[in-house]
Design a protein with these regions (language model features):
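Helix-adjacent hinge/juxtasegments
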Residues: 57-81, 86-88
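Beta-strand-connecting loop/turn residues
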Residues: 45-46, 65, 144-146
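Extreme N-terminal tail/first-helix region
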Residues: 1-18, 159
Length: 159
C-alpha cells in the first residue's frame, strides 16, 4: 500500500470540514507530547476550539502556545491478500495543521466563534448566556502550515 501527499489546499480543507473531532498536540512542562481530542470549528484558515476556563492544558499553553492539530476521515480497512497480514492497511486521508493559540476574551467574539464551532455539527441556532460565555475558554488558532496525506492506496490507484 502506498501513501501520497495531498497538495491541494481545498482537499485538505475538505478533510478538516468532514472530520468529527480533531486531536490537539501540545507540550507539557517536561517537554513531553500531550494530545487532546476536541470539538472544533474551521473558517477562513482559522481553527476554533473551546474548553473549560482552567486546567492543565491551559497552563501548558501559557508556557508554549504552539500546537499541532490533526484531522482524519474515510477510514477503511483494505488489503491485497486476505491471508497475508502485512498486506493490510487502513485507507484514509489526514490533515495536519500547525499554529499558535490565542485566547479570546471579547464576549461578542466568543459568541461568533462558538456559533462557528456549533455550525460544524448542526444547523441549529443558539444563544449563549453571559455566565456561560464568561466560563468558557475560546481558542483561536490561525493555521501557519497545513499538510495532508492519503494512505492505503494500492499500486494502481491514484491519489
Amino acid at each position: 500500500m502506498r501513501t501520497f501527499a495531498i497538495e491541494e489546499k481545498e482537499r485538505i480543507e475538505s478533510i478538516i470540514r468532514q472530520s468529527a473531532v480533531c486531536h490537539v498536540g501540545i507540550t507539557d512542562p517536561e517537554g513531553n507530547p500531550y494530545v487532546i481530542p476536541m470539538n472544533f470549528g474551521y473558517e477562513d484558515g482559522i481553527i476554533y476550539l473551546h474548553s473549560g476556563p482552567e486546567g492543565g492544558k491551559l497552563e501548558m499553553l501559557e508556557r508554549n502556545n504552539r500546537v499541532c492539530i490533526t484531522f482524519s476521515r474515510g477510514h477503511e480497512l483494505v488489503y491485497q491478500h486476505p491471508k497475508v497480514a502485512c498486506s493490510y492497511s487502513m485507507r484514509s486521508e489526514s490533515a495536519m495543521c500547525r499554529g499558535r493559540v490565542t485566547f479570546i476574551e471579547d464576549m461578542e467574539e466568543k459568541r461568533r466563534i462558538l456559533d462557528i464551532i456549533m455550525h460544524h455539527y448542526t444547523d441549529n441556532e443558539f444563544g449563549y448566556s453571559e455566565p456561560a460565555l464568561r466560563n468558557v475558554k475560546v481558542w483561536k488558532v490561525p493555521v501557519e502550515r497545513m499538510t495532508g496525506k492519503v494512505f492505503g492506496l494500492r499500486g494502481h490507484e491514484k491519489p
